[in-house]
């Protein structure tokens, strides 16, 4: 088997979004699984629309998710001399030609064709032009598309694709200012980089016959193509920012783990048996682009959150502390190692994202300044006050390093007072955490420690 070489080639006209990252992941997995090469190419020939910030953000996103590319990043804007060389080669071999048609002439032609209910297209009027070029017109360069031939290729996702060249006009490969066009530079670079397999979105499917025309004209080897359907939202519509089509780095800010995001995106359009959770090693072992689905996949926040929660639960305390650094939350320095472990172990089970985990840390470590109203209103204050006073005294004599001792202290109150557990636990929870839900009470007492627990009960009794 020959060396597999893939690439990801974004345009830096905007930030890397979720669909682009999925394409990059598919290319990365296929190359790495076969001990091949994976390249990153920045398609920045459209100088008027390029953004340095967007290009840097793409590189930053790659670093975050751990997609390591081979070699240097290739920037197309630095390769104009190479493109000019190949444009001249096509001109010299009479496989391309200068077209002097003005914009006004082209617009007029299109209007005439529309009036005749024909598909607007260039009419090849300069294809075999031998006369004197009109003055004042900077020509474009067009490729001579072979006439009445069938271009066919076996797409790894879509199957057999056939297009008659009569449906393709002599398209422009160099603009009037000399800059090369998208289809031309993509073909040149894929060939010169030795790309064997092109995995990309199916919005590029219509470009492929044009690129094959160029491969053949330049006697380049044609790569294998895999055109992946787009990602839709859960209503079956194109992704919007609200539904997930946002900058990849926003997911880091929202508290998603890179392992969860890679796992989630790899499963959008690809599957292996009925597995949902994949380590990177498993993805490398089982991914094959031939298994990509031919129908669109749906972006599900529920599935992403479920996966993220799974990966969050499997992080150690030390790993969580590193991951939490970008987020703001209460100071942890007063907690001893056992309290810190208990806090994060308890909260990671109840959190779906790092951002949510940071908020829950605040909910535990920040003393309540108000209490959940609907829970507070249900309390029998005549019963609650003496119970908490008694428990406060019991806590003063309890070993806070022993969670079972804390649990026994709570049960002792319930047994001695002959009351239902909820009649005591609910007001205690409200006193400690300010609300009716949250982590277990023995965990809360252990994490807060003796002084803070008693202080919170006293504050509650004042209210």
Swiss-Prot record:
GO terms for biological process: glutamyl-tRNA aminoacylation. Keywords: Aminoacyl-tRNA synthetase, ATP-binding, Cytoplasm, Ligase, Nucleotide-binding, Protein biosynthesis. Its EC number is 6.1.1.17. It catalyses: tRNA(Glu) + L-glutamate + ATP = L-glutamyl-tRNA(Glu) + AMP + diphosphate. One of its GO terms (cellular component) is cytosol. GO terms for molecular function: ATP binding; glutamate-tRNA ligase activity; tRNA binding; zinc ion binding. ATP binds at residue 241. SUPFAM superfamilies: An anticodon-binding domain of class I aminoacyl-tRNA synthetases, Nucleotidylyl transferase. It is found in: Cytoplasm. A motif ('KMSKS' region) lies at residues 238-242. A motif ('HIGH' region) lies at residues 10-20. Belongs to the class-I aminoacyl-tRNA synthetase family. Glutamate--tRNA ligase type 1 subfamily. Catalyzes the attachment of glutamate to tRNA(Glu) in a two-step reaction: glutamate is first activated by ATP to form Glu-AMP and then transferred to the acceptor end of tRNA(Glu). Monomer. HAMAP family: Glu_tRNA_synth_type1. This is Glutamate--tRNA ligase 1. It comes from Helicobacter pylori (strain J99 / ATCC 700824). The gene is gltX1.
